[in-house]
Every structure is written in C-alpha cells, then in structure tokens.
C-alpha cells in the first residue's frame, strides 16, 4: 500500500490544482512501459531527459518514482528543482520548489510492472522540497 501525503502552501489556484491532481494521480499510479514516460501533468516543465535502458518511472504530477536503471534529469528555467534518491537507489523522488511533498512508501510491489523487474520498494523513502 502506498501512502502519499502532500504538504503545500495554498497561495494560488495553481498550487491547489497540483495538490488535487497529485492526490488523484498517486492513488491510481502504475508503472508504465519499459521506457521512462512522463504524465501529462509534467507538461508545464521546460524539458525532461532520461538516461538508462530498461528502466521504469512512475511520474505523477510533481513527483516521479524511478528504478535505479532509470535516471532522470529535470530542468525548469526559473525554478530550482531537486532530485533525491534513497539509500537503496531504487526510487527517485522529484519535486518542484513551489510544492512541498512528503512521500512514504511501504515495502512491496508498486503498480503492475511484470516479471523479474517488479520493483520492491524500501520501507520508507522521504524527500521534502520547501517552496
């Protein structure tokens, strides 16, 4: 079971929108194809590049979870972004600085990724970016 808690400043309608979309997206989050793919919510970012083959990412709203074989680099002109990888290097958590996100993941398989590539997430992965 995946628990996602969003902590954000509701200073604008945009922030509220990302909050609502984020909660909805993570509730139904699934690992996509073998290629790293970005959800439609990420379209506001200037560019997204991924390296590595056979990796998988689950990207929802402002948070992206990636296998260690899928390393993503994110850029946005006027925003300082951050990428954090937990100790086991299995999961990367991304967030723009306008949103503070706390992601807690229980041990087990997330989504519907098949076969030997099924992802076993560590007990807890935390990353917070404050606006």
UniProtKB/Swiss-Prot annotation:
UniProt miscellaneous comment: Completely overlaps DLS1.
UniProt name for this protein: Putative uncharacterized protein YJL064W
Biological source species: Saccharomyces cerevisiae (strain ATCC 204508 / S288c) (Baker's yeast)
Lineage: Eukaryota, Fungi, Dikarya, Ascomycota, Saccharomycotina
């Amino acid at each position: 079971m995946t628990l996602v808690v969003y902590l954000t400043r509701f200073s604008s309608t945009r922030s509220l929108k990302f909050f609502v979309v984020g909660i909805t997206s993570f509730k139904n989050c699934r690992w996509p194809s073998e290629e790293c793919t970005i959800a439609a919510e990420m379209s506001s970012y200037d560019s997204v590049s991924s390296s590595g083959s056979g990796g998988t990412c689950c990207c929802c709203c402002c948070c992206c979870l990636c296998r260690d074989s899928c390393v993503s680099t994110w850029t946005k002109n006027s925003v300082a972004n951050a990428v954090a990888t937990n100790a086991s290097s299995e999961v990367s958590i991304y967030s723009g600085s306008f949103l503070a996100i706390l992601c807690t993941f229980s041990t087990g398989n997330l989504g519907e990724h098949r076969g030997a590539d099924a992802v076993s997430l560590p007990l807890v992965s935390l990353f917070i970016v404050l606006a």
